[in-house]
């Protein structure tokens, strides 16, 4: 905090992002969004029993908690390493000709840019845009660059790079599998075309996967923001659409199919409306609307943190529509009861 404040930045550990309400919404969106991620939910099909599923969920929560609690520490260390590289001691700035190799490597990618504004041959780093000479430092490079900045051994750098690549590929593969199976098996075969052949179902799965890859490629060319912000946005969309339906499907026997569908469409629709109003339709900056509204006009909430409010809309609409439509069939209500009370369990018995 002392080093950050010396350079004119806000204190790191006590800095509140816009407001306490916004921070609460951000945290809640990440929490419930995690529970609604499709590639996480699908992992429960890999265990044989309910007991193993619960154990798997418990261990998943442990590792997710470790990830969430250590991420701010990694960010703090990365920021401190960069500041100590540029300003090793108070008032002594790094000479441009003596900048380390990692500096030059990332300059070649265009993700790190310096500009000697005062012509003194040194790099000044400060919160003042007019005097700051580190004009661009892409936040997406910090995880990969941090071991090199800290001068760790090459094998550590390779391990971090391999871990990042493996995480990206495994997540992408899990999401593609979830998307393709949901559309081909659950939607087409389970709802609209129950007599569809296996070959047609496989072709539908391939088409859905190709469409998902095309959509991901488009978002790669027009990213909504830096990586962490984009991930938070994805968690918010999962929170506003999947999580409420998942919870009501487990704990409510009165929510109807029409209510669940209406709730999901309303939740994700409201969230996308708020996100696109800030970032442009399909994240194209020129395709904006309601420009007269101030940024974060809904109680100072950022678009990446809006997922929890979309979830509230989802719950409300689903419950309302369920009251206006016929009750679910008995077999569905029995299925919900069976989910909560697994096979082999029974009601509590009072022993004398």
Kindly give the residue locations of the regions a language model identified:
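Membrane-embedded helix-loop-helix hairpins and adjacent transmembrane boundary segments
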Residues: 1-352
């Amino acid at each position: 905090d002392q080093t950050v404040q010396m350079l004119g930045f806000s204190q790191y550990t006590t800095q509140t992002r816009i407001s306490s309400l916004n921070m609460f919404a951000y945290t809640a969106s990440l929490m419930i969004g995690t529970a609604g991620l499709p590639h996480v939910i699908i992992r429960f099909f890999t265990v044989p029993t309910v007991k193993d599923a619960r154990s798997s969920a418990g261990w998943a929560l442990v590792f997710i908690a470790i990830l969430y609690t250590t991420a701010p520490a990694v960010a703090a260390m990365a920021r401190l390493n960069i500041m100590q590289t540029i300003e090793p001691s108070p008032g002594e700035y790094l000479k441009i000709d003596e900048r380390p190799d990692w500096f030059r490597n990332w300059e070649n990618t265009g993700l790190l840019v310096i500009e000697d504004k005062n012509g003194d041959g040194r790099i000044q780093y400060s919160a003042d845009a007019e005097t700051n000479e580190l004009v661009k430092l892409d936040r997406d490079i910090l995880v990969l660059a941090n071991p090199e900045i800290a001068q760790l051994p090459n094998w550590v750098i390779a391990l971090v790079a391999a871990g990042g690549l493996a995480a990206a590929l495994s997540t992408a593969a899990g999401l593609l599998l979830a998307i393709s199976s949901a559309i081909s098996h659950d939607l087409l075969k389970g709802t609209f075309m129950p007599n569809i052949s296996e070959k047609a179902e496989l072709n539908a799965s391939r088409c859905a996967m190709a469409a998902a890859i095309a959509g991901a490629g488009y978002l790669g060319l027009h990213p909504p923001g830096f990586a962490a912000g984009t991930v938070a946005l994805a968690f918010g969309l999962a929170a506003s659409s999947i999580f409420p339906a998942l919870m009501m499907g487990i704990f409510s026997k009165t929510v109807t199919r029409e209510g669940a569908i209406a709730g999901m469409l309303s939740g994700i629709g409201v969230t996308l409306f708020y996100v696109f109003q800030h970032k442009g339709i399909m994240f194209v900056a020129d395709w904006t609307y309601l420009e007269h509204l101030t940024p974060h006009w809904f109680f100072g909430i950022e678009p990446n943190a809006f997922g929890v409010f979309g979830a509230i809309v989802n719950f409300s609409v689903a419950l309302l529509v369920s009251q206006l439509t016929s009750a679910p069939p008995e077999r569905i209500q029995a299925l919900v009861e069976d989910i909560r009370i697994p096979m082999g369990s029974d009601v509590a018995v009072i022993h004398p």
